[in-house]
Amino acid sequence: MARFINPFTDVGFKRIFGQAIHKELLIDFLNDLLVGEKRITDITFLDKDLLPDFSGDRGVIYDIYCTNEDGEQFIVEMQNREQTFFRERALYYLSQAIARQGERGAEWKFNLKAVYGIFFMNFHLSHSPGKFRTDIVLSDRDTNEVFSDKLRFIFLQLPCFTKEEDECQTDFERWIYVLKNMETFQRLPFKARKSVFEKLEQIVDIASLSKEDRMKYDESIKVYRDHLAVLDFAKQEGLELGMRQGMVKGIEQGMAKGIAKGIEQGKNEGEMNERLKNARRMKTKGYPIDDIADITGLSTEEINSL
């Protein structure tokens, strides 16, 4: 049995990075991520309701919204599956954070604060499957000179990070190694090197969870595992459908179309069935409707009708 929480779950991710009482963890991670660029000394968590809400994202995307002492904003996300318009969605989120800084009247001089989007991706991004870290800025197409530093995207493809413990050379790499392998540890590495990992070990120890938090975590891990099972089933169904179509239209063309269609159908049908099943079980156990909606991604109307 795992000793430490799974950071790819909603409860796990937010326990590590989303608690004001333990905000030093997120501060340390951001400083290691942006080492050599800036030094953050404090953050304030913002109301996540300020972010655009898409009910279908719940259950597979978990986000945290905060600002630092200089007023710069950070959106930190964990995403467990790729979406068709993943890049557009990221651009929309950050653009909304920029737009909300506007003030009415002639006195405002467009003195914008930078907005950073940090996206943990627990999957291979289809258009750049082999690159772990991708940094996106607004720059001149010909000279590569930065046009503006007010919008920054950092994509982290976790499956592409393959370093072992003794191969990690920076504190940022140590963070990623710990997050990616957390469930397999009986003790966290790097504690002697950096005190934040000592603090992290205390926070992520499952034995330290209260009874209520443990119940929420157990449901969160169930939703996460069901999601993985749905994806595996969808991929298999897509492969079989693709091969059947390939017999008629050619193996290569048929597999491509069949897999895409099968995966989409499998995701939609399988995920909804799992969400309803999880919500029904949580409702029976007396969970608050808002907690059920947050974990499963269902609307309150759908939950009340169960």
Label each PLM-derived region with a short phrase:
Residues 1-306:
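Elongated, amphipathic alpha-helical interaction scaffolds
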